[in-house]
Amino acid sequence: MVEKFVGTWKIADSHNFGEYLKAIGAPKELSDGGDATTPTLYISQKDGDKMTVKIENGPPTFLDTQVKFKLGEEFDEFPSDRRKGVKSVVNLVGEKLVYVQKWDGKETTYVREIKDGKLVVTLTMGDVVAVRSYRRATE
């Protein structure tokens, strides 16, 4: 089921991402340019339930990140937004990848799903919701 997420994805649209970054406590220099970032996502799968999500933002920057995980298993994460003590878990729920991060008594959720051939990521922190959509890159 996760196979449909595998591949290279380029940003197509971003809504409210800067506000989302503010809500999670990202530094001002990150949140101010949130919707202007143009990331490419590389999603790969190995041995069924092991995945890697790599995010590049054009020329190499401190915002670039890579996360390796096994579905359903909690892992320590070191996000590029500089939050500390983040524990994350990613689960396949129906046809969606649901990614939950917890730190300092807070929680945020990323839901990745395929809609009309696009990868749509809905990020939620409290009552702040951001939506970013990606188109599959042509090789």
Curated annotation (Swiss-Prot):
GO biological process: bioluminescence
Keyword Cytoplasm: yes
Keywords: Cytoplasm, Luminescence, Photoprotein
Species in which this protein is naturally found: Anguilla japonica (Japanese eel)
GO cellular component, as recorded: cytoplasm
Main location: cytoplasm
Gene Ontology MF terms: lipid binding
Protein's job: Beta-barrel protein that binds unconjugated bilirubin with high affinity. Excitation of the bilirubin-bound protein gives rise to green fluorescence, both under normoxia and hypoxia. The apoprotein is not fluorescent. Does not emit fluorescence in the presence of ditauro-bilirubin, urobilin or biliverdin.
Domain comment quoted from the record: Forms a beta-barrel structure that accommodates bilirubin in its interior.
Name the UniProt record assigns to this protein: Bilirubin-inducible fluorescent protein UnaG
Biotech relevance: Becomes fluorescent upon binding free, unconjugated bilirubin, a heme metabolite. Can be used as diagnostic tool to detect abnormally high levels of free bilirubin, which are indicative of impaired liver function. Could also be used in research as fluorescent marker in eukaryotic cells and animals.
Binding site for (4Z,15Z)-bilirubin IXalpha: 57, 61, 80, 112, 132-134
One Pfam match: Lipocalin
Tissue specificity statement from the Swiss-Prot or TrEMBL entry: Detected in small-diameter muscle fibers from the white muscle layer from juvenile animals (glass eels) (at protein level). Detected in small-diameter muscle fibers from juvenile animals (glass eels).
Family: Belongs to the calycin superfamily. Fatty-acid binding protein (FABP) family.
InterPro entries xrefs: Calycin, Fatty_acid-bd, ILBP, Lipocln_cytosolic_FA-bd_dom
Subunit field text: Monomer.
Location(s) in or outside the cell: Cytoplasm
